[in-house]
Amino acid sequence: PTSFAAIEAAIDKLHNPPSMYGFVAPNKVDENFMSQVLEHVFLANGLSPVGSDGFASLDKQKTVEVLDFYKKIATASPPGELFWKQSREVYFAGKAAMIIWSPFILDELAGLRDSAPPTINDDPTSTELASKTGIVTTFGGPSNPSGAAWADIRYFGVTSDANTDVATQFVEYSMKDGYTATLSIAPEGKFPVRRGEVTDTAKYIKAWSKLPVGVDRKAPLS
């Protein structure tokens, strides 16, 4: 489902606790994970506190739509305090129909990490849950049908007291000849902001898509 309405309809169809919860949404307000998920829901409905002139006030109707939707998915979630760990565990046990999580979940979902295995069956290396999981990268609310994704861009910073010549060489290497190696550090959680070079505009996209992921076992990203 790629819209608030479609997700709500799926919850109405699939929510059957305690054997199956329609959703597992974070509710632990002092965890950054909930902030990220809630921000994604705000963006999905076309809301951001940042405007061209700095701070932008939130539209009341759009905000109410966001909060009503979040209340719906939170109500369809298991009881108790939920953040990244619990939400992943509930989904991996096959007890939740839907979850909002970062792509860092992908290698674990595929049974490639022993410390966070799928528990939907007795085989911690099983790809059964992965085969039954669909990935949605963007979704939209009633005030923003085109939807939005959530991401953060990572930057290199060079301090004023650093060896700036050496640091500059490292940054240049990391963003060019070493860019694929940079992406190879947990590639399931990254997406290349540099898609390629002039001579091959998809060079880094293609290289990234084939990088191995996993902790205790490896598999190609695609």
Task: Label each region the model flagged.
Residues 22-25, 97-101, 134-137, 156-158:
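Structural recognition of the beta-strand scaffold that forms the well-ordered cores
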Residues 2-8, 79-93:
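Short helix-initiation/N-cap motifs at beta->coil->alpha
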Residues 8-13, 17, 52-81, 124, ...:
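Glycine-centered hinge/linker elements that transmit conformational signals in sensory
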Residues 5-55, 96:
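Extracytoplasmic/periplasmic solute-binding protein
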Residues 22, 97-102, 108-109, 117-120:
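Paired acidic/hydrophobic, glycine-rich loop segments that form the ligand-binding mouth/hinge
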Residues 8-15, 39, 67-74, 88, ...:
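Non-transmembrane alpha-helical segments in soluble domains
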Residues 108-117, 121, 126-128, 141-222:
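C-terminal lobe and pocket-closing loops
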Residues 1, 48, 76, 161-167:
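Short helix-loop capping/hinge motifs at secondary-structure junctions, enriched
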